[in-house]
């Protein structure tokens, strides 16, 4: 299917911020890295590789991208999956070997019958969500956006009854007949944010460039949808309502929330590399000046993100610097389509992300690190939890550091997850650790197993009678 920029033949409500807000502040960058080698490529007969989405998930780096396998019917774009210990790869299929095709066209009669491409993957609780571009054939305005769900990021089930969740608005028809696609998703404060291309949007440029943002508390955007307009987010009746405001002039961009900077970032490609642009929560102001991750490119970047689409923390100084890493296609291959996925990155330094206790708790939320007693400490929901087993801390955290941040030393330990400690489960309630007589719900079924805990089955009434601690839901 055609790419949004027309260059190649294949497709490639939050809480208010504290005042005063920074405005166009220059950032200091250092530690430019990457680009020395191709880190991922499809095996078999894959002739192109581009449009990655990159997730730092526990102790591994996971990546999904657009390619094509002849062995994955029907003929057309497929979404591949591979993983590696770090961003520098090499990325392989689960257990080694070639990357796996995990989502392909659904066949005749469906909006994504032939092509699935441009993945954006996030995890909320125990569910992975894959937002993607789908097309039935290579025809004008044929691209729309779908979503699939998975318990593991490997086996996917199409949501919304297999129907698209975002279709072209058809506000205006230009020479660029791509339609709607190239989604990027983030989960923040209970909202699913979805940024995407729509070449039929009213606010696009003459060549169809532009990025639009919707948000909803429903992952399939079936209701309660808000669209980013000129004055912030406003309720709209449908996901194809007129596109009145584009947040940036770009194709194939990626979105991320950076808690350390209290800002959204959008990554898109410019002449010198990947431009990182900064926006406040309402996308109405620019708190910081753009930075550029330099180097060659041929298609849009995939930012390295945590499972919820947030920026990873620095392993060296989580309150003082922020890593920005991308994977992007760098050459046009034999199939005249982008390939050679390589990693590039840099750090923003001199950040004052933890000026007070409240900001410290927000920035470091979801982080696990070694404790002074040879166990692990997990910061979640404003509470520091001591965890006997590292594997359990990994399962419950958004990110694990090998070096303990000094800010942890100022926090009291609220509870301890002891090895083989008590856990309970109840119908329609889930699973929880019992810590000091209180329920601490978890969304990782593996966590009690990894802890050696046998979850006792109780009734919903018994569950509801327990006093509650904080949620350990990621």
Question: Which ranges hold each PLM region?
Answer:
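Glycine-centered flexibility motif
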Residues: 35, 146, 179-181, 302, ...
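Beta-rich carbohydrate-recognition and catalytic domains
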Residues: 1-50, 55-112, 123-176, 187-247, ...
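Residues that act as N-cap/strand-start positions at coil-to-secondary-structure junctions
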Residues: 46-48, 115, 179, 249-251, ...
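Conserved beta-strand position repeated once per blade in WD40 beta-propeller domains
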Residues: 51-53, 118-120, 182-184, 252-255, ...
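Surface-exposed interaction/gating patches
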Residues: 247-266, 367, 372-375, 427-430
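Generic recognition of flexible, low-complexity loop/linker segments
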Residues: 182, 252-254, 312-313, 364-366
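Short, surface-exposed polybasic-aromatic patches that bind anionic ligands, especially phosphate groups
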Residues: 354-474
């Amino acid at each position: 299917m055609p790419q949004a920029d027309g260059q190649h033949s294949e497709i490639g409500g939050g809480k208010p911020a504290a005042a005063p807000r920074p405005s166009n502040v220059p950032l200091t960058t250092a530690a430019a890295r990457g680009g020395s080698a191709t880190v991922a490529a499809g095996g078999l007969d894959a002739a192109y590789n581009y449009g990655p989405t990159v997730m730092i998930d526990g102790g591994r780096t996971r990546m999904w991208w657009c390619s094509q396998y002849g062995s994955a019917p029907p003929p057309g774009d497929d979404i591949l999956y591979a993983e590696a210990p770090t961003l520098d790869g090499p990325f392989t299929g689960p257990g080694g070997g070639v990357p796996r095709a995990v989502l392909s066209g659904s066949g005749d009669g469906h909006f994504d019958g032939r092509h699935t491409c441009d993945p954006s993957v996030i995890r909320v609780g125990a569910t992975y969500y894959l937002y993607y571009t789908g097309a039935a054939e290579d025809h004008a305005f044929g691209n729309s956006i779908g979503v699939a769900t998975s318990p593991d990021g490997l086996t996917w089930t199409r949501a919304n009854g297999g129907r698209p969740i975002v279709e072209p608005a058809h506000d205006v028809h230009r020479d660029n007949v791509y339609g709607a696609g190239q989604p990027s998703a983030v989960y923040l404060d209970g909202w699913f944010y979805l940024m995407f291309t729509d070449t039929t949007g009213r606010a696009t440029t003459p060549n169809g460039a532009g990025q639009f943002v919707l948000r909803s508390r429903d992952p399939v955007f079936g209701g309660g949808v808000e669209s980013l307009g000129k004055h912030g987010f406003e309720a709209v009746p449908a996901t194809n309502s007129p596109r009145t405001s584009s947040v940036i002039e770009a194709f194939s961009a990626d979105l991320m929330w950076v808690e350390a900077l209290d800002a959204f970032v959008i990554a898109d490609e410019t002449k010198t590399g990947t431009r990182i642009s900064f926006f406040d929560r309402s996308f109405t102001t620019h708190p910081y000046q753009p930075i550029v991750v330099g180097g060659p490119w041929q298609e849009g970047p995939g930012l390295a993100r945590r499972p919820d689409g947030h920026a990873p923390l620095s392993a060296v100084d989580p309150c003082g610097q922020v890593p920005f890493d991308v994977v992007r296609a760098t050459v046009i291959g034999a199939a005249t389509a982008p390939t050679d996925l390589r990693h590039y990155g840099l750090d923003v330094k001199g950040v004052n992300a933890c000026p007070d206790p409240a900001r410290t708790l927000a920035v470091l939320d979801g982080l696990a690190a070694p404790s002074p007693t040879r166990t692990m400490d997990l910061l979640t929901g404003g509470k520091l939890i001591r965890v006997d087993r590292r594997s359990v801390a990994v399962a419950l955290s958004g990110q694990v550091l090998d070096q303990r941040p000094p800010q942890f030393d100022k926090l009291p330990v609220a509870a301890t997850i002891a090895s083989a400690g008590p856990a309970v489960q109840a119908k329609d309630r889930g699973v929880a650790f019992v810590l000091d007589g209180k329920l601490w719900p978890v969304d990782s079924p593996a966590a009690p197993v990894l802890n050696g805990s046998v979850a006792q089955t109780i009734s919903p009434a018994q569950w509801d009678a327990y006093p509650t601690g904080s949620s350990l839901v990621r």
